[in-house]
Amino acid sequence: SAEYTEHWLATTNSTEKTDQGLTAYLALDDAFMSIASRIHLIRKAKHSIDLQYYIWNDDFIGHMMLHELLKAADRGVKIRLLLDDQNGTQLDESLQALATHPNFEIKLFNPYKYRKFRAIDYLFRLKHINHRMHNKLIVADGVIAVTGGRNISREYFDASESFQFTDLDILFFGDAVKNANQTVIQFWNDDLSYSVQQWSGQGTKQQVERSRQHYLQDTQSHNDL
């Protein structure tokens, strides 16, 4: 992830504070503010968005985030999404489709060798497959980030009808984002990170458009949340 000198948060004062090694932060204990902060970063990004998540569910919240990322990619923002393969295969078709976009790169961390019969991995490859990535991070333009305890799923954002998790995130801007950028690079280039095409196949442009319409319809149907 690059740190861009020209970005939407750049002011003389903010640059001076960052040069002094200072970091501004905001605790996001409210679930709505937490998801809104992520979406705001995606919508304001001009150059790049890097994301790393342990859980990204095939639900309304997951679809809304993917829809926002796809719109960002459409306007020229470079997207890098790293997901732990603990998610399962529910998102495979969507990820295949999105990875065909020229501005959208997707990798799986430590993918299961037998992705549709995972019990085999647990029986014979437990030591290897137990090495998971629990990161929960989004960095926009290399200068502002959100991290914390929330995965991308309804239960983390007061959008589930059954139960909710109580978590805390931090929105931060300044010198500490350099560490977040280093984390992005470290895990993205890790030997256990594989492109989604290597493990779940190649998508098509038709799939991208189907996914786009599906995300839009799902998001519109939940406007009351």
What are the roles of these predicted feature ranges?
Residues 134:
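Histidine-centered active-site/metal-ligand motif
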Residues 1-131, 140-225:
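Charged, low-complexity intrinsically disordered terminal segments
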